[in-house]
């Protein structure tokens, strides 16, 4: 590798919303915040969990859901 062209690779803490702290290394010098990790993800825990993240479909339904709700006969 060439000297002085690569970014600094530092140790950082990635904190999950459940409180789990993961130590990792990154070129990003600031701590990271994660939504899910292996301690709280439904795939790893086997529990169904509703995440508080609304997608584009939910946003569309909340704005335009009432327009197609009733059908005139």
UniProtKB/Swiss-Prot annotation:
Keyword tags: Metal-binding, Ribonucleoprotein, Ribosomal protein, RNA-binding, rRNA-binding, Zinc
SUPFAM superfamilies from the UniProt entry: L28p-like
A Gene Ontology cellular-component term: ribosome
UniProt KW Zinc keyword: yes
CC cofactor note: Binds 1 zinc ion per subunit.
InterPro entries, per the entry: Ribosomal_bL28/bL31-like_sf, Ribosomal_bL31, Ribosomal_bL31_A, Ribosomal_bL31_sf
GO biological process, one term: translation
Binding site for Zn(2+): 16, 18, 37, 40
The keyword Zinc appears for this protein: yes
Domain of life: Bacteria
Required co-factors: Zn(2+)
Molecular functions (GO terms): metal ion binding; rRNA binding; structural constituent of ribosome
Summary of the function given for this chain in its UniProt record: Binds the 23S rRNA.
Family assignment from sequence similarity: Belongs to the bacterial ribosomal protein bL31 family. Type A subfamily.
Complex and partners: Part of the 50S ribosomal subunit.
UniProt protein name: Large ribosomal subunit protein bL31
Species of origin: Pseudomonas syringae pv. syringae (strain B728a)
């Amino acid at each position: 590798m060439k000297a002085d062209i690569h970014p600094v690779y530092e140790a950082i803490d990635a904190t999950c919303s459940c409180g789990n702290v993961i130590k990792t290394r990154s070129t990003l010098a600031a701590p990271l915040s994660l939504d899910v990790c292996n301690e709280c993800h439904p795939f790893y825990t086997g529990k169904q969990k509703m995440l508080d993240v609304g997608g584009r479909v939910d946003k569309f339904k909340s704005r335009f859901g009432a327009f197609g709700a009733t059908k005139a006969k």
